[in-house]
Amino acid sequence: MANNAVLRIFTHYFEANRIIMDSVKIIEIKKSVFEDNNLDADALRKELKAKGVFLLNLMSSPGSGKTTTLIQTINRIKDKIRVAVMEADIDSDVDAVKIKEATGIPSIQLHTGGMCHLDAEMTRQGLDNMPMEDVDLVILENVGNLVCPAEFDTGSSCNAMILSVPEGHDKPLKYPLMFSICDVVVVNKIDVLPYFDFDMDKCREYVHMRNPKARVIPISAKTGEGVDEFASWLMEAVNDWKKR
């Protein structure tokens, strides 16, 4: 069945630290949900590799702290690598503006027209509106959802996810797919561990049941605890990818 979606791209251009908001570009997307997505994703991955651009697909449920984690992480690495961000949401440009104001890096907002994920073609359309010749690392903050984003290959070089303490340590058992495809699981909001029945050891155990190779990194995006480890992991991932 054809699935109609609208991907609206808010492009922010940066000149002398000023934001010039371009007019909204509206692109109609009409395709079957899974039609050729894996082929599209593989093709996009090869193109990005040829350009030397690493694409990180960051997933999580809503409210897990993706944007705050990105701000903390980007501010630790932006002097070492050229970074840009694509923010995917059903509506609003709040996160893209927040990223720009807090980090000063290029960011665009993708509106999915009600869809709960991005696929490879939608990701490509976002990348087409980015200054790719001036970027080494693009971080895609996918739509907040623990199910749909994991089902669609975006063409990323690497998948990451954030699990927050209030969500519970049993999420890897309930939502196995996302945990099984991620190279790293960031456990955010460890500053509130005393107030929740969250067992970090159980969380690690359950993550590794789904994905023995996944790295588990506890952090607090609010206090900054553990963010250095995630930033180091990301830089290592990019450098290792460049050598392959």
Language-model features: locations:
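Active-site glycine-centered loops adjacent to acidic/histidine catalytic or metal-binding residues
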Residues: D89, N188, S220
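Short, Lys/Arg-enriched N-terminal segments with co-localized hydrophobic residues
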Residues: N3-I20
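Conserved strand-to-helix beginnings and helix N-cap segments that scaffold or border functional pockets
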Residues: T67, A96, A120-E121, P172, ...
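Canonical P-loop GTPase G-domain recognition
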Residues: V192-R244
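Conserved C-terminal guanine-recognition region of P-loop GTPase G domains, centered on the G4
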Residues: P149-S156, V165-K213
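Conserved beta-strand segments of the P-loop GTPase G domain that flank and frequently precede/overlap
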Residues: L58, L110-H111, M161-S164, V186-K189
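Nucleotide-state-sensitive switch-loop elements of NTP-binding domains
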Residues: S23-K46, K51-M59, S64, T68, ...
